[in-house]
Amino acid sequence: MRSQFKDEHPFEKRQAEAARIAQRFKDRVPVICEKVENSDIPEIDKRKYLVPVDLTVGQFVYVIRKRIKLPSEKAIFIFVNDILPPTAALISTIYEEHKDDDGFLYVLYSGENTFGEQNEKEDGKVKKIPIDISELDFSCINEPGV
């Protein structure tokens, strides 16, 4: 997905800003947060965040929920490079693994699970993990307590 922020600001300007932020705020990472195009979820009031390095993905999702005033019964999904990051992962870890060449981490959010699955490596092979509980296979469960 194309970032509106990238479209509006030239690479050199974004890179210089991210470098300045990294030098000035050692305990924070620069994040651009944007809504997935055509998502039925509210637009966020600001896109640029300086996120503490010890914040988890789940805590950042909470920040997004509050900023868009999303009720707790509504689902929200965030994506980094078209994957769903683990909620327990630190933003600093996600930043190191997925930051853009310009120095920003680009996070997209949506009310739908746009990409459908989360990938996980097992024995060097990518395995698909269903995200929606309706995709789970419970046929191996015969009786309670078994």
From Swiss-Prot:
GO terms for cellular component: autophagosome membrane; cytoplasmic vesicle. It is a lipid-anchor. InterPro entries: Atg8-like (IPR004241), Ubiquitin-like_domsf (IPR029071). It is found in: Cytoplasmic vesicle, Autophagosome membrane; Vacuole membrane. The record marks G116, E117 as: Cleavage. The keyword Plastid does not apply. Residues 117-146 form a propeptide. Its main location: membrane. Ubiquitin-like modifier involved in autophagosome formation. With ATG4, mediates the delivery of the autophagosomes to the vacuole via the microtubule cytoskeleton. Required for selective autophagic degradation of the nucleus (nucleophagy) as well as for mitophagy which contributes to regulate mitochondrial quantity and quality by eliminating the mitochondria to a basal level to fulfill cellular energy requirements and preventing excess ROS production. Participates also in membrane fusion events that take place in the early secretory pathway. This is Autophagy-related protein 8. It comes from Lodderomyces elongisporus (strain ATCC 11503 / CBS 2605 / JCM 1781 / NBRC 1676 / NRRL YB-4239).
